[in-house]
Amino acid sequence: MFANVGWGEMLVLVIAGLVILGPERLPGAIRWTAGAVRQARDYITGATSQLREDLGPEFDDLREPLSELQKLRGMTPRAALTKHLLDGDDSIFTGRFDSTSSDQPGSGKPPKPQSGPGPAAASGPAATTTPASTPFDPDAT
């Protein structure tokens, strides 16, 4: 409950309590708050142990689905889709459908042939210094 309250927030609460309650009533208020938190913690622990005692082995069966729900609560939509619908295969999201040795350099994969009009055999330094043109897709317009 107070797991994400830092020292800065605690200092602000103490200073606010000092201003609101005053120095003579602040220690009593801190003692009362600590006692109330301790009583609540003891009550919750007692209720949990009472449930565990009454339910017996069924209590663990009840906790198992709750722990699975807790795991799902922290999951992103992409991770949930990957885990439950795609059995952990996230290649549809990453675009790496075949992670064989063809992705490694020097695998003997032939270069992609150039399509479209152009010089059949370009030679000399002019072929290496021409800038790469952006591909044009007439269907995209």
From Swiss-Prot:
InterPro entries: TatB
Record-annotated membrane-spanning stretches: 2-22
GO MF, one example: protein transmembrane transporter activity
Disulfide bonds: none
Membrane topology recorded in Swiss-Prot or TrEMBL: Single-pass membrane protein
UniProt record, GO biological process: protein transport by the Tat complex
Major location (coarse): membrane
Keyword check for Iron: no
Residue ranges with Low complexity bias: 117-141
Disordered: annotated segments: 92-141
This protein's UniProt keywords: Cell membrane, Membrane, Protein transport, Translocation, Transmembrane, Transmembrane helix, Transport
Gene Ontology cellular component terms for the protein in this record: TAT protein transport complex
Protein origin, superkingdom: Bacteria
Keyword Cytoplasm attributed: no
Compartment(s): Cell membrane
Family named by the database record: Belongs to the TatB family.
HAMAP family in the record: TatB
Subunit structure: The Tat system comprises two distinct complexes: a TatABC complex, containing multiple copies of TatA, TatB and TatC subunits, and a separate TatA complex, containing only TatA subunits. Substrates initially bind to the TatABC complex, which probably triggers association of the separate TatA complex to form the active translocon.
Task of the protein: Part of the twin-arginine translocation (Tat) system that transports large folded proteins containing a characteristic twin-arginine motif in their signal peptide across membranes. Together with TatC, TatB is part of a receptor directly interacting with Tat signal peptides. TatB may form an oligomeric binding site that transiently accommodates folded Tat precursor proteins before their translocation.
Protein name: Sec-independent protein translocase protein TatB
Species this chain originates from: Mycolicibacterium gilvum (strain PYR-GCK)
